[in-house]
Structure formats: C-alpha cells, structure tokens
Regions:
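Transmembrane helical segments that form the transport core of multi-pass membrane transport proteins
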Residues: 36, 58, 62-67, 205-302
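Membrane-core helix-loop-helix motifs of multi-pass transport proteins
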Residues: 114-182, 188-191, 328-358
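Hydrophobic transmembrane alpha-helices that form the pore/transport pathway of multi-pass ion
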Residues: 82-84, 88-132, 295-309, 337-341, ...
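Interfacial loop-to-helix junctions that mark the boundaries of transmembrane helices
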Residues: 3-9, 31-41, 153-165, 191-196, ...
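Membrane-interfacial loop-to-helix junctions in multi-pass transporters
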Residues: 39-41, 70-83, 112-123, 197-200, ...
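Flexible interhelical linker loops that connect adjacent transmembrane helices
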Residues: 2, 66, 179-203, 235-239
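Structural signal for alpha-helical transmembrane segments and their membrane-water exit/capping regions
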Residues: 2-32, 44-59, 179-182, 208-236, ...
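C-terminal transmembrane helix pair
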Residues: 159-170, 279-367
Length: 367
C-alpha cells in the first residue's frame, strides 16, 4: 500500500522511468547511452531549482506578490495581479516553481477576502500564465532550457522566435481576467517575513545560474559555486530541489534516445514532421507532455523555431500537456473539495481555447 501511495505521489518520474525501461527492451543498454544525456541542461536545471528553493525559503517571492496584490482593491484587479505576478515569476523562475510559489498565495488571498468562488478560474489563469508566459526566456521551463542548449540557439534569435506567441498569450490571459467581477475586497494585512541578507546572497546565486544558462560562464563552474554556497548557507534548499523532475528529465533522455534508434519510429516521425514541426509538436505534447515531446522530436528535426513554438503553445490543452498543470490540479483539489468535475470542465474549456487560438495564429504567422 505504501509503495502504491509513493508511486501515486511521484507519478511522473515513475512513468518516465517505466517508459525508458520499455524502450531499453528494444534498444539494450550500450555505450551509446552515454551520449543521450545533456549534462549541461541537467546542471542548469538543478542550479535554478536549488536557488529558487532558497529564495522561496527566505520569503522573497510571497512578499513581493503580497505587496503587489495589496495595491489593488477589487476581486478583478487582485486576481489580475496574482496572474501577472505568476507570469513574471515564470519568466524568472521555472513554470512549476512559479505555481508552487504563487498558487498558495492566491488561496490565502481569496480565502481571506471571502472570494473562494473565483478559485478555479484564478488557478487556471495562473496555470496558463506559468505555462505560456514563461516561454519568453530560455530558463523559464525545462523544454526551453533543453532546446536552447541542444540547438545552441543565439540569445537574440530565441527572443525573436518567442516574442509573438508570448505577446498573444499575454493578451489572451489578460482578456480572460476580465471575467472576474469588480467586487470590492480588503486584502489581508499579514505579510510574510523576509531575510534580506539571504535574499541578496541568493540573488547573486540566481544571477550565476542565469549566466550559466546564457553561456556567460562555464556550467561546471556555476554548478560547483552554487552547490558549495548552498551547502554552507542552506542545505534545506538542496533537499528541497524537485529531484523527481531531474529524474524525469534523465529518464526521458533515455526514452527519446532509444526511440530515435528504433527504425519504425524514426520513419513515422520523419513522415509526420514533413507536415510541419509546430503542429506535430503541439499535438504530441497533448499526449506525452511538452518536455518529453521536445526531447523526442529534437532527434528528428532541425526546424527548431517551429519545434520551440510548438512545444510551448502545446503546454495548453490537456491536463498532461504540461507537467506544471498537474501542480495546479493538485493544489486546487487540496483546497476545494467536491468540485473536481467543474474544475476539469473549466480547465479544458480555457486551455483548449488557448491552444486553438495560438495554434491557428502561429501557423499563419510562421508561414
């Protein structure tokens, strides 16, 4: 029973490891396996997760969000502020970290002001903000980080590729915030304590992690410096890293590497990608989620602009299209009981609506 509970709580890494194991039956382990793993991507992801965990422990992100929300006095403006801070947070952190940080804050604000009836839509819009708003920077989500390193995309070109879908996504998200009524509310005055000295030190470490991603310093140097600093300053941050995400990533490297060596699979994806990498990437993401879709499809195409856009807008749609969406679902069901069906219906309506608009618009834009 305990094993089943553990597997249920860690479903994604378990599924990823099982998928890798199945492909290993068709491609037995050999020396080529060593070439599957992008050590730089794994190192950068680890450093970002560790530093962000340290910053969250120091109380910085909840404090910034609370002060932003306190400047607004209606349900619509408060929810918009929460959604915007999630969007901005996803660009600086990772999408899952932004949700882990700001979804609890939203519940605190909505419950404290008697506006829990807006929890479902607020959480869904924050989910869209995290998954779609974070597409603008290379280090905001795992698929961007991987593709940025895999194709060695120049910084300026990355921004040029992702700016149009980012602007459209932001406009759609802000438009949906208008669905929240302008009811007057009083935001709770309680403020999260913050350790200013630690925030400054961790801010320097975050800049170091960003420099690693942007190729400003060698990744091994940043990895050594950040790990050593946190071992001294905050070992809990290292323990708090989402190790399941790192295991998932490593397993999907194995999965995609093996799939790329199975000839019928190679033939199938080459035929599919001949019809356009972007729609194939977006639709593949609906089934296996956008991180493994990015890793898998990168083995079969050099059209990285279309693949990059496809896996990012493919984060909208099904609940599994982005792993971060499972965080939103888990957080909602933890706080709100008996409304799961309503939440899933609203989630599907909003998320598939976003996917349809973005896919149509970007297909036209990238012709």
């Amino acid at each position: 029973m305990k094993v089943l509970q553990w597997c249920r709580a860690n479903a994604m890494p378990v599924i990823a490891v099982l998928a890798a194991a199945v492909t290993a039956v068709f491609v037995p382990p050999d020396s080529a396996y060593l070439g599957y793993y992008d050590v730089k991507t794994l190192s950068c992801l680890f450093c970002i997760l560790a530093v962000v965990c340290a910053l969250r422990g120091a109380g910085l992100f909840p404090l910034l969000a609370q002060r932003l929300v306190r400047a607004f006095h209606t349900a619509r403006s408060a929810v918009t502020a929460l959604v915007v801070v999630t969007l901005i947070g996803s660009m600086l952190l990772t999408n899952d970290t932004a949700l882990l940080t700001f979804l609890p804050l939203s519940w605190f604000v909505l419950k404290g002001t008697g506006q829990t009836k807006h929890t479902a839509l607020t959480f869904i819009l924050q989910n869209c903000a995290a998954n779609l708003g974070g597409m603008l920077t290379p280090f905001s989500n795992p698929q961007n980080l991987y593709l940025f390193n895999h194709y060695t995309i120049p910084n300026g070109e990355f921004l040029t590729i992702m700016l149009p879908p980012f602007l459209l996504s932001t406009a759609l998200i802000l438009a949906c915030c208008l669905l929240i009524p302008r009811e007057t509310l009083t935001v709770p005055a309680q403020e999260t304590p913050v350790d200013k000295r630690r925030c400054i030190v961790y801010g320097v470490l975050f800049c170091t992690a960003a420099a690693m991603v942007l190729r400003g310093i060698p990744y091994w140097l940043g990895l050594a410096a950040i790990t050593a600093a946190l071992l001294v300053l905050d070992r809990r941050a290292l323990l708090g890293v989402d190790w399941g995400l790192l295991v998932t990533f490593a397993a999907f490297f194995t999965f995609s590497g093996n799939m790329a060596r199975i000839e019928p699979v190679r033939t199938l994806f080459r035929q599919l990608l001949a019809h356009g990498a972007m729609p194939v990437a977006a639709l593949t993401s609906q089934v296996i989620s956008n991180v493994p879709a990015a890793i898998l499809l990168s083995q079969f195409t050099d059209d990285y602009p279309a693949l990059l856009v496809g896996v990012n807008i493919g984060g909208a749609g099904t609940l599994v299209a982005s792993l971060a969406s499972l965080i939103t679902f888990r957080e909602y069901t933890k706080h709100v009981k008996g409304q799961t069906g309503r939440f899933l219906a609203l989630f599907s309506a909003v998320s598939f609506g976003f996917l349809a608009v973005l896919l149509a618009a970007m297909t036209f834009w990238m012709q």
